[in-house]
């Protein structure tokens, strides 16, 4: 959060804010069964990942960021600044904008290779907030709970719109997001 608000240039190594994500793996490296489709995050108080569904999130900051992932290198090779509005120019670390992402309606003249590269450039919705849940578990099946844990919930793809819509609804109701608590749940959807 300190980097996002300009208090830290990112040059010092420190503790990162844990990410809230959806678990898609049926087991961990130790063979423990994990709850697929549940939210998970790293809980530093227990030193392990914790899983739960549903969870609540009290959002404080909402922003977006373009990132370009290189599967061969297994790393992000470019990222834009964190921006809060589509009216802002998303300058990236390589000197371009939006990590080279081209609007869908302008892609008709691209080669198959260029189209494939476009699929590796994504816009992420970033929501910084406080995570809470009562009925969680660890990978070993121990029950746990989390209360007001600072997290980053980073979504893209099909999860981008529902998160954005929920925050837009708060804006339309003239409610400050940090005065609200969102209930997050997942639903399995099959492709095709």
Kindly give the residue locations of the regions a language model identified:
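Extended serine/threonine-enriched, polar tracts that run as long, contiguous segments within proteins
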Residues: 123-192
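OB-fold ssDNA-binding interfaces and closely related basic DNA-contact patches used
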Residues: 1-144, 191
